[in-house]
Amino acid sequence: MEKALLLYSGGLDTSVMVRWIKEKMNMDVVTLTLDIGNSDLEEIKEKALKLGAIDAITLDVKKEFADNYISREIHANGLYGEYPLSTALARPLMAEKAVSVANENDIKFIAHGSTGKGNDQVRFEVSINALDNNIKVIAPVREWNMTRADELEYAKMNNIYVKSDGKYSVDENIWGRSIEGSSIENINEPVNDDAFEWVTPPQYCGSGEPVSIEFYKGLPSSLNGKSMDLLSIIKNLNIIAGRNGIGIINMIESRLIGLKSHEVYECPAASVILKAHKYLENLILNKNELSVKNYIDNFWSNMVYNGLWFDPSMEHMNQFEKSSNQYITGSVNLRLYRGNMILEGIESPYSLYDYNTINYETGVFDQGSSKGFIDIYKNETVRSNRVKKALTVIH
């Protein structure tokens, strides 16, 4: 009998699929669960086997996610609008591991639980087939055109126990938590406080607290004076920033497939790290470097959002981002206060900021030299306007 490898989270969608694939496609099911955040791997494995999976594979990939994926996003100041790409960034890692496990176990089918309305179906399928075009991808929710109500009814009819996980649909990893469904889909209503688990809404926060982040070659290397690996810094900052109201993103999002959606995210650590990194870049890189980098950063972010992590152009951009971050070393001090990140100090051995030159109280910079610069700088614009005005009068 053929086998299908199911990317299994333990939630409603993928729990229903274990039975559905066996029943509708006459395949044995092997599940793959990746811990990218807070997954209880043993509990999920036990559940998959009870549902009829012939094997349940679990992998803890949090450190790999931080070191090989999040690190590249930090270099690239990865944002899609306001969104730090937390879910989008995890999908290529999941696809990579799924292809590897499928090849090791001679499995020719990979199934995922994404709907036909979202971005993840694209991210999974492009990534999987970019890595191995011989693997066939199965998308039961899309192919069966299932709604959440359909899934619940199927689970009930087949005695599939699904733990109630509240009124919201949640996806989380160490870089962020996305919240969908329920009242969030009504854009004329405020998001209820019960949607948030990582971030205390700003109105309930205290007097704030300072944080200090040191960067080495564009990546965080210490937090509040303590050296840590990137994963540990992210874990600690999720707690510190979250209790100070940092990281709630509430936005109208333009999905890859052409739909508008109301998206709510909690990304406390990501918000702080990306803000601090950008402050440091602005201190160290010159105007031309920043201009080029801003363009590449935006292009990089759109590629990740659109599921093109394994496109060859990404490798070229990653090389540029690594090169442009080689001097992004220094420290950034922020005060986290009721949802705000206030810069309280920044320094770097590569800083281009010259206090003696910019200070209005000193005479280091000869202000008179600006006159000659302006005369040359304005020439093209002034001449263009003069010529056009003269021609307008003639006609």
From Swiss-Prot:
L-aspartate binds at residues 115, 119-120. Its EC number is 6.3.4.5. L-citrulline binds at residues 83, 119, 123, 169, 178, 253, 265. It is found in: Cytoplasm. ATP binds at residues 7-15, 113. It is an enzyme of class 6 (ligase). It catalyses: L-citrulline + L-aspartate + ATP = 2-(N(omega)-L-arginino)succinate + AMP + diphosphate + H(+). One of its GO terms (molecular function) is argininosuccinate synthase activity. Its main location: cytoplasm. SUPFAM superfamilies: Adenine nucleotide alpha hydrolases-like, Argininosuccinate synthetase, C-terminal domain. PROSITE patterns: ARGININOSUCCIN_SYN_1, ARGININOSUCCIN_SYN_2. Keywords: Amino-acid biosynthesis, Arginine biosynthesis, ATP-binding, Cytoplasm, Ligase, Nucleotide-binding. Pathway: Amino-acid biosynthesis; L-arginine biosynthesis; L-arginine from L-ornithine and carbamoyl phosphate: step 2/3. GO terms for biological process: argininosuccinate metabolic process; L-arginine biosynthetic process; urea cycle. GO terms for cellular component: cytoplasm. Belongs to the argininosuccinate synthase family. Type 1 subfamily. Homotetramer. PANTHER family: ARGININOSUCCINATE SYNTHASE. This is Argininosuccinate synthase. It comes from Picrophilus torridus (strain ATCC 700027 / DSM 9790 / JCM 10055 / NBRC 100828 / KAW 2/3). The lineage of its organism: Archaea, Methanobacteriati, Thermoplasmatota, Thermoplasmata, Thermoplasmatales.
